[in-house]
C-alpha cells in the first residue's frame, strides 16, 4: 500500500478512537510509518517470531538480533515507531529475551520494548511484568 492508502485506514481508525496499531509478528513498510507520522498513530513493530526462544538456538537468536537492528536502523527515526516487541506469544529463556531487548535498547532508546505480545499464555511462571520490560502488550 502507498502512503495515502495507509493514511485512509488510519483516519478511519482514528474516527473510532483508535490511536495504536500492533503489527503481529512483522514490521510494516516505510509507507505505513510515513502515514502514521502524518496522522498521529502509534505503531508497534514486532520481530517475525512466534514460539520458544532457547539459548541453544544460536542461529535463530542471531537472526532475530540482526533483523531487529535492521528494523531499528530503517524505521527507528519515525515518531510513530513507539513500541518494539520480540514477537508474539513467546516463551522460553528470559535471559535470551533480556539480551535481545538490551541490545535493541542500547541501539535506540527512543522506543518502549517488550519481550513480546501475549507472552507465556497459559504458563503461570511468566505471567505479568518481567524485569527489563518497559511495557506489557496483551490484546
Predicted regions and their residues:
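N-terminal carbohydrate-binding accessory modules
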Residues: 1-13, 34
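A conserved hydrophobic secondary-structure block that centers on an alpha-helix together
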Residues: 10, 15-22
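Substrate-binding/catalytic cleft of secreted carbohydrate-active enzymes
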Residues: 20-139
Amino acid at each position: 500500500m502507498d502512503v495515502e492508502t495507509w493514511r485512509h485506514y488510519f483516519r478511519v481508525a482514528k474516527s473510532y478512537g483508535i490511536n495504536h496499531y500492533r503489527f503481529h509478528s512483522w514490521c510494516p513498510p516505510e509507507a505505513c510509518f510515513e502515514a502514521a507520522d502524518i496522522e498521529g498513530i502509534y505503531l508497534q513493530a514486532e520481530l517475525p517470531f512466534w514460539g520458544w526462544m532457547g539459548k541453544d538456538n544460536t542461529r535463530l537468536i542471531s537472526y532475530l538480533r540482526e533483523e531487529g537492528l535492521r528494523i531499528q536502523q530503517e524505521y527507528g527515526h519515525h515518531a510513530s515507531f513507539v513500541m518494539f516487541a520480540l514477537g508474539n506469544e513467546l516463551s522460553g529463556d528470559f535471559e535470551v529475551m533480556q539480551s535481545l531487548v538490551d541490545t535493541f535498547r542500547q541501539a535506540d532508546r527512543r522506543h518502549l520494548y517488550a519481550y513480546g505480545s501475549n507472552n507465556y499464555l497459559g504458563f503461570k511462571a511468566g505471567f505479568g511484568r518481567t524485569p527489563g520490560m518497559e511495557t506489557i502488550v496483551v490484546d
